[in-house]
């Protein structure tokens, strides 16, 4: 990297403020690319316990507004969790239990116990929009507390009793934080190219989801959260987007953790459907379930 920095300095004069800013921007972008194509040292993943949501944000990257009501099977998750635990010797960096809205799952406590059983040392977060927190049963709070699971709330422009939520978590001795201190005001529109005309490698290196939002779904690991949930979009809008075998890696066919980590750090065929250069920030709203929210 130092040799590259010296090479760049030959073309970007540093004495001016503009030159310094351009140099820093270039180095930062190169560092992002390097991070995306470098396999992680440890496992991290997110898993969607519920496909649907009780909020349904416009531009939702998990396509929850157009997803049918669906709950992750506890036994299937335990099977996958056990397999990953075997491959990674029970070591994990962090795990995110999410949705959809995970608090909608009637067996949410089971997922807390299962995840901690197979990964005793890693960080485990349960991500929620907070709407149902104050209505959760004692078994929920006990599961979080006994398994050292952090309750993470993303605040939206809703009437949530923030103080009561904080007090409840303190009373239950559950670790709690807001994902952002202020309510979300904007959402990212991540448009799809329905013709699949984009360059997969270029997209991968420019995408903040790539080799970051690792997702476990139905016995496979994915480099991002788009592919494992895109079927909801395809089914709802009757689109002909092709998902192939090589878009994810089967955790039961690999022989080592390195195979998984290496796969997650590489572009996949489905990357051609993401229109990275057209991504925009939009005002947060609830979904109208129109195709324009994702194209």
Predicted regions and their residues:
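Short, flexible coil/linker elements and helix-boundary hinge sites characteristic
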Residues: 1, 10-17, 89, 148, ...
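Radical SAM enzyme core and accessory elements
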Residues: 1-33, 273-295
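Exposed alpha-helical structural elements
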Residues: 3, 7, 76, 83, ...
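Conserved alpha-helical substructure of the radical SAM core
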Residues: 7-9, 18-126, 133
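Soluble or luminal CAZymes and related metallo-dependent hydrolases
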Residues: 72-76, 107, 161, 199, ...
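Flexible, charged surface loops at secondary-structure boundaries
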Residues: 88-90, 144-146, 265
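Conserved AdoMet/S-adenosylmethionine-binding subsite of the radical SAM
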Residues: 104-227, 232-233
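Accessory C-terminal segments flanking Radical SAM cores
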Residues: 192-295
């Amino acid at each position: 990297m130092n040799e590259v920095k010296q090479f760049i300095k030959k073309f970007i004069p540093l004495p001016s403020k503009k030159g310094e800013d351009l140099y820093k921007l270039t180095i930062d972008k190169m560092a992002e690319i390097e991070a995306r194509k470098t396999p992680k040292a440890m496992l991290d993943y997110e898993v969607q316990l519920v496909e649907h949501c009780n909020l349904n944000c416009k531009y939702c990257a998990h396509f929850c507004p157009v997803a049918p009501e669906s709950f992750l099977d506890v036994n299937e998750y335990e099977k996958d969790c056990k397999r990953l635990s075997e491959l990674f010797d029970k070591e994990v960096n962090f795990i995110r239990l999410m949705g959809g809205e995970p608090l909608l799952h009637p067996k949410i406590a089971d997922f807390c116990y299962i995840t901690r059983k197979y990964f005793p040392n890693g960080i485990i977060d349960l991500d929620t929009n907070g709407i149902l927190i104050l209505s959760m049963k004692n078994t929920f709070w006990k599961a979080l507390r006994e398994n050292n699971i952090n309750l993470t709330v993303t605040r939206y422009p809703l009437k949530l009793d923030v103080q009561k939520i904080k007090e409840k978590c303190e009373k239950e001795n559950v670790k709690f934080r807001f994902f952002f201190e202020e309510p979300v005001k904007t959402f990212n529109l991540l448009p799809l190219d329905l013709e699949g005309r984009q360059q997969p490698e270029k997209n991968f290196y420019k995408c903040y989801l790539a080799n970051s939002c690792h997702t476990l779904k139905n016995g496979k690991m994915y480099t991002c959260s788009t592919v494992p949930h895109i079927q909801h979009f395809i089914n709802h809008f009757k689109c002909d987007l092709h998902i192939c075998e090589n878009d994810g890696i089967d955790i039961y066919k690999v022989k080592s953790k390195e195979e998984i980590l290496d796969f997650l750090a590489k572009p996949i065929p489905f990357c051609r459907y993401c229109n990275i250069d057209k991504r925009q920030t939009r005002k947060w709203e609830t979904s109208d379930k129109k195709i324009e929210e994702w194209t």
